[in-house]
């Protein structure tokens, strides 16, 4: 499989030329991080000024909710940190870092979720989310939806409300969308798992 199996999920988010250019920057790495996994590396997008501009503009054009419907953007560690703050700044919103366990000083809110082999925990600082603050959760990829659903639980446990989700890439066939419930949702690119 190659870039030719990647397609734009929201055609209104970018021109065909921009979509082709953005997709051309995504590397497909077979058998990484382990055998049988087809890894989509979009780190080259961040090294390319045109690619980064296309990505940010497309994310804004494809927002699943109007900017008046959320107060802040929350990004998941690690790649959600790469575009989440830039997206938040362009929209005039604050940014909330959702970290892996043990990376933040106490007190924190924490939420654990199941992985294929074990479990993981996400955390946010105790003061990151204001009561009833409406949060747009962003991440680079949705596969099974486990980490995104845990991020929702984490935001809600801190007193916030999830306004919606936005992802750069969506792996088809893993049913990640189901884990998100009825929240507004968007992804820029789709590809087979």
UniProtKB/Swiss-Prot annotation:
It is found in: Cytoplasm. GO terms for cellular component: cytoplasm. One of its GO terms (molecular function) is adenine phosphoribosyltransferase activity. Keywords: Cytoplasm, Glycosyltransferase, Purine salvage, Transferase. Pathway: Purine metabolism; AMP biosynthesis via salvage pathway; AMP from adenine: step 1/1. It catalyses: AMP + diphosphate = 5-phospho-alpha-D-ribose 1-diphosphate + adenine. Its EC number is 2.4.2.7. SUPFAM superfamilies: PRTase-like (SSF53271). It comes from the Bacteria. InterPro entries: Ade_phspho_trans, PRibTrfase_dom, PRTase-like, UPRTase/APRTase. Catalyzes a salvage reaction resulting in the formation of AMP, that is energically less costly than de novo synthesis. HAMAP family: Aden_phosphoribosyltr. Belongs to the purine/pyrimidine phosphoribosyltransferase family. Homodimer. This is Adenine phosphoribosyltransferase. It comes from Bifidobacterium animalis subsp. lactis (strain AD011).
């Amino acid at each position: 499989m190659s870039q030719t199996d990647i397609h734009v999920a929201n055609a209104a988010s970018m021109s065909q030329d921009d979509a082709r250019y953005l997709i051309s920057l995504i590397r497909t790495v077979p058998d990484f991080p382990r055998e049988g996994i087809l890894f989509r590396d979009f780190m080259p997008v961040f090294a390319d000024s045109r690619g980064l501009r296309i990505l940010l503009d497309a994310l804004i054009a494809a927002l699943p909710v109007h900017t008046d419907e959320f107060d802040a953007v929350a990004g998941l560690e690690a790649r959600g940190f790469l575009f989440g703050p830039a997206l938040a700044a362009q929209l005039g919103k604050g940014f909330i870092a959702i970290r892996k366990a043990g990376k933040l000083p106490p007190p924190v809110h924490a939420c654990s979720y199941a992985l294929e082999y074990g479990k993981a925990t996400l955390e946010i600082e105790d003061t990151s989310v204001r009561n009833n603050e409406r949060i747009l959760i962003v991440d680079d990829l949705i596969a099974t939806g486990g980490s995104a659903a845990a991020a929702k639980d984490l935001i809600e446990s801190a007193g916030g409300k999830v306004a919606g989700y936005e992802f750069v890439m969506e792996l088809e066939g893993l049913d990640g969308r189901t884990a998100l419930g009825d929240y507004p949702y968007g992804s820029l690119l789709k590809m087979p798992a």
